[in-house]
């Protein structure tokens, strides 16, 4: 702390921290009346800082005290006593401040931020610090206004900071190529196995034990045979009967190995070929031509009707015993002939009148489980 420049004021330095203000007043009071004694203390600890200022009422007393007391040992320490003076660089009545620049000049020199250039500000202390791994470190150069600071690049932060976007991309590419051969075992297995394969295809590739020795038509027959067992539950029977019969016809065509004895002479395939080609147009109700043309050939229909029904019943009974089903329902071919008779009465086919006599004799002689066709129709 600088005091006002007065002729009777002296500076006393090099004091012991145990020296008190009252002791100084008593010692220097021998040279003349003392007007004021100031012992400089620390603001926080309140301890002596080792120097003091003393003011005499007369300037001549101050000069005598400087001559007599300079270099004297006081409380074990040699003290320095001299005339207190204000520094020549400062004006009277103003406080000591560091040299300053103008605003424009300070701002132009301080606010410089670049990779190669540095700030040239020469005023005020600088405070450097790393901002948590960033590549730029603030360099606070306080000017006279205290508002400007410069930011310069820290060379160590370039190495310690996060990599740039280009370097991160190249590092990621190198890591992908390097780790391609060291992927986990789980991903290798999943890459070899097919993705998104439905459960049905896997079930077809690995059939159950009950499917051994059967072709794809066998599985088709098992699925369609369920529709055949539910045959008696439908009220509209024409389309369902034709669909089920066509499925069974395809099934018998694929059973060459297991049912070779039925295909020898009286099978469905030979009987079907003896019926001839199709000559009748499709009916108005969407009937199947294959079933309508069974009645167009009188020789094939009348001559081979009974063996056909006996063979068909034997085939269906053996098929159901093979698939493990206990219930046996009437074959769809008999139902088709029965529907053909009903169509004749309603007049759907133009050629049905030619063979009405043969169909009547056939339907009267044919029985299912000991019940004539007409009584069976009434029961349904």
UniProtKB/Swiss-Prot annotation:
Biased segments, Polar residues type: 166-178
Biased composition (Basic and acidic residues): 180-190, 333-351
Tissue-by-tissue expression: Testis-specific.
Domain RRM: 8-86
Keyword field: mRNA processing, mRNA splicing, Nucleus, RNA-binding
Pfam family, one: RRM_1
Biological process terms in GO annotation: mRNA processing; RNA splicing
Any one GO molecular-function label of the UniProt entry: RNA binding
One annotated Gene Ontology cellular component of this protein: nucleus
Compartments, record wording: Nucleus
Annotated region (Disordered), positions in chain: 82-226, 279-358
Protein's job: RNA-binding protein which may be involved in spermatogenesis. May be required for sperm development, possibly by participating in pre-mRNA splicing in the testis.
Extra remark: The RBMY1 proteins are encoded by repeated regions of the Y chromosome. The exact number of functional copies is unclear and may vary between individuals, and some of them may represent pseudogenes. Overexpression of Rbmy proteins in mice carrying the Y(d1) deletion that removes most of the multi-copy Rbmy gene cluster does not have any effect and fails to reduce the frequency of abnormal sperm. These results raize the question of the role of Rbmy proteins in sperm development.
PANTHER family named in the record: TRANSFORMER-2 SEX-DETERMINING PROTEIN-RELATED
Listed name of the protein: RNA-binding motif protein, Y chromosome, family 9
Organism: Mus musculus (Mouse)
The gene coding this protein: Rbmyf9
